[in-house]
């Protein structure tokens, strides 16, 4: 495949992990921020289609490679045929599961090809396992709920960054969904616990962890949290949004037929 030939072959554990992260980021984009475009490309009327992720964090829907056996393990074949026969959420979850399987297959293909020993394989798996899966991010089951991102940037004057003193109820926070999440019920003695929770918070688009110097926004529909840059929302733009819908929720509307 043309996209695969453009990237150097990883040979060390770190290089294989970097390759894995790049491909994973591309697949996450396809199933979250670019989901509308992805949905349209996966046409059931076309031949067997696959979803590919590349090391440069891009993705592509294409036919499988013609060479047999292929140079790399191939992703699930014919994902387009089930698109209209399932609920959209279930179909995307299925694609995400197969995407995770493919990512592992590619990573350990490189490991086998370049003779990784037991310790290298174990280290590679641990590095991979420390990241949320594509499935977890695409379905919102990764740790990123309002209960996990709490008061950040204490002392900040921004209305979109809640401080340790601004403990608000759910009804009060609805109007400032762009701020870091606030717990509904928080005791003063839980602040240390909150710091631990926020370490595991991840963006629903790119899968990266929360950074205190970054702007985040929460979807009012699915309650996933996203980097503003990942969903192309700035603090200024967010100020005029009454109810924010992420790209995935924006296309979830009744389909005829």
From Swiss-Prot:
Which UniProt keyword terms apply here?
Chromatin regulator, DNA-binding, Metal-binding, Nucleus, Transcription, Transcription regulation, Zinc, Zinc-finger
Q: Name one GO biological process term.
A: response to salt stress
* Localization of this protein: Nucleus
Bias (Low complexity) occurs at 153-166
Query: Where are the compositionally biased (Acidic residues) regions?
Result: 187-199
Question: What are the transmembrane regions?
Answer: none
Domain of life of the organism in this record? Eukaryota
Tissue expression notes: Predominantly expressed in the roots.
Return the InterPro entries for the record: Alfin (IPR045104), Alfin_N (IPR021998), PHD_AL_plant (IPR044104), Zinc_finger_PHD-type_CS (IPR019786), Znf_FYVE_PHD (IPR011011), Znf_PHD (IPR001965), Znf_PHD-finger (IPR019787), Znf_RING/FYVE/PHD (IPR013083)
Q: What role does this protein play?
A: Histone-binding component that specifically recognizes H3 tails trimethylated on 'Lys-4' (H3K4me3), which mark transcription start sites of virtually all active genes. Transcriptional regulator that binds specifically to DNA sequences 5'-GNGGTG-3' or 5'-GTGGNG-3', including promoter elements of the salt-inducible PRP2 gene. Plays a role in salinity tolerance.
Q: What is this protein called?
A: PHD finger protein Alfin1
């Amino acid at each position: 495949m043309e996209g695969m030939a453009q990237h150097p072959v990883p040979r060390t554990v770190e290089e294989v992990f970097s390759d894995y992260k790049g491909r994973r980021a591309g697949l996450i984009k396809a199933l979250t921020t670019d989901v509308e475009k992805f949905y349209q490309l996966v046409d059931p009327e076309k031949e067997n289609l696959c979803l590919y992720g590349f090391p440069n964090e891009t993705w592509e829907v294409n036919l499988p490679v013609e060479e047999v056996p292929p140079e790399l393990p191939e992703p699930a074949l014919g994902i387009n045929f089930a698109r209209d026969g399932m609920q959209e959420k279930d179909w995307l979850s299925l694609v995400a599961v197969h995407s995770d399987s493919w990512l592992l297959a590619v990573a350990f293909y490189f490991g086998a090809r370049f003779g990784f020993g037991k310790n290298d394989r174990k280290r590679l798996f641990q590095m991979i396992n420390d990241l949320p899966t594509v499935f977890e991010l695409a379905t919102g089951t990764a740790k990123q709920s309002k209960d996990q991102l709490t008061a950040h940037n204490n002392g900040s004057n921004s209305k979109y960054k809640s401080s340790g003193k601004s403990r608000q109820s759910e009804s009060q926070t609805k109007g400032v969904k762009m701020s870091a999440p606030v717990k509904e019920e928080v005791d003063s003695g839980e602040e240390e616990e909150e710091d631990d929770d926020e370490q595991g918070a991840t963006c629903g688009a790119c899968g990266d962890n929360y950074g205190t110097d970054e702007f985040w926004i929460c979807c009012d529909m699915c309650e996933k949290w996203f980097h503003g840059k990942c969903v192309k929302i700035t603090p200024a733009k967010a100020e005029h949004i009454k109810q924010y819908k992420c790209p995935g929720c924006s296309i979830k509307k009744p389909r005829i037929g």
